[in-house]
A protein has these predicted regions:
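N-terminal targeting or regulatory segments adjacent to alpha/beta-hydrolase or S9 domains
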Residues: 1-68, 76
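Proline/glycine-enriched tight loop/beta-turn segments at coil->beta junctions
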Residues: 79-82, 90-100, 110
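Cap/lid segment of the alpha/beta-hydrolase catalytic domain
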Residues: 96, 102-195, 205-206, 252-255
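Mobile cap/lid helix-loop segments that gate and shape the active-site cleft of serine hydrolases
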Residues: 176-187, 199-200, 237-278, 283, ...
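Alpha/beta-hydrolase fold nucleophile elbow
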Residues: 209-221
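Glycine-rich nucleophile elbow surrounding the catalytic serine of serine-hydrolase chemistry
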Residues: 219-231
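Short beta-strand/loop motif that positions the catalytic acidic residue
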Residues: 281, 288-290
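C-terminal catalytic histidine-bearing segment of alpha/beta-hydrolase fold enzymes
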Residues: 307, 313-346
């Protein structure tokens, strides 16, 4: 009998092994490649939801570890709101405007709360310590205004959490379920989340201590996904830090199935691989964090991704705008270059 395969997973991986994305950067003219590729990549995201008035409401102000914080509620869509945490540097003076960083969270129970420094329980402290996760809080202490919202399916916007608990997910990942819903409407989770992030950015730019001309974005893991898409979709972003979200879809996606509906769009891999997506941000400044001991995105293929991004930035005559923080930890924020990087470019 011929050698047969009954595993769909093996089928997809073998497809990936022989696949070359149609618009993978081949070393040609960068400007022509970017001009042709970026609109096609954006089209894979589908429709973006309509924008609505923000109707901001300040819920509470407090101070934590010297950092003044605010919790706001804003409307980010016709049928959906988001809670927003804003952190201000301890040395912020009246009338002063500061560079501002969008601090995007990744997967995890607590969403934006950990990134913005909520260490109010042993479980929350453990997550922050394990991932060096409170970069929104740390960057505020370093002199930047920072802010964050929850993405769909995580933190306060997860339907498994009170007070809006829904048990019908049956243990399935809400990221995948929301993606299925979104595609039925011709959208994607990325297009919806990006729109919600842009709404939050619109609001924060109205605050008197925010300089709207000096915006950056950073995020770990799934937050790295959203950092990348925010950077590509929102021209206001002057610099970006992608933390532990470098790899090849052939490996972390098709082989390891280490992705979800929050990270994908129909036909995206037909067009580009992850290093191509990162390279499309050129020539703007990009800092990439890679953990040597990362068991989520293996250092071997993470570095292969980074070397491809290096070639794209070189073709864009922007090698000096690409930086690497290679650090000896697990899946986490390196945090060794972030302050200087954003201090230089914002």
């Amino acid at each position: 009998m011929a050698n047969r395969n009954l595993s769909p997973h093996h089928m997809f991986w073998q497809m990936a092994l022989e696949h070359k994305p149609l618009h993978s950067f081949d070393g040609g003219d960068f400007a022509s490649w970017q001009k042709e590729t970026l609109p096609k990549v954006m089209a894979t995201l589908g429709d973006f939801p309509d924008r609505v008035p923000l109707n901001p409401e300040l819920m509470v102000e407090w101070e934590h570890d010297g950092v003044k914080k605010q919790r706001w509620m804003i409307d980010v869509g016709k049928f959906i709101s988001a809670s927003l945490i804003v952190s201000m540097p301890p040395d912020l003076k009246p009338g002063e405007k500061r560079p501002t960083i969008l601090a995007w969270h990744g997967h995890g129970q607590y969403g934006k709360d950990s990134v913005m420094g909520n260490d109010s329980s042993p479980e929350r402290r453990a997550e922050i310590d394990r991932l060096n996760y409170n970069y929104g809080h740390q960057m505020a202490k370093a002199g930047f205004v920072t802010f964050a919202i929850d993405w769909m399916g995580i933190g306060e916007r997860c339907d498994s959490h009170k007070p809006h608990f829904k048990g019908h997910a049956g243990g399935r990942d809400w990221c995948n379920l929301y993606y299925l819903h979104a595609t039925m409407f011709g959208m994607t989770s990325i297009s919806i989340n990006v729109t919600h992030g842009m709404a939050a950015t619109d609001f924060v730019c109205t605050l008197p201590f925010v300089d709207p001309d000096r915006l950056g974005v950073m995020g770990l893991s799934g937050g790295g996904t959203m950092t990348l898409w925010s950077a590509l979709c929102d021209e206001r972003m002057k610099a970006a830090e992608i933390i532990c979200y470098s790899d090849l879809w052939e490996v972390f996606g098709m082989r390891d199935t280490n992705y979800c509906g929050m990270q994908v769009a129909p036909g995206l891999y037909k067009l580009v691989d992850l290093p191509d997506l990162q390279g499309l941000f050129a020539p703007k400044p990009l800092l990439v964090d890679i953990g040597v001991y990362d068991t989520c995105f293996n250092v071997d293929t993470a570095m292969e991704c980074y070397r491809k991004v290096e070639k794209i930035y070189a073709a864009a005559d922007a090698s000096d705008k690409l930086e690497l923080d290679l650090f000896p930890r697990e899946h986490a924020w390196g945090g060794n270059k972030s302050r200087d990087f954003f201090g230089k470019y914002l």
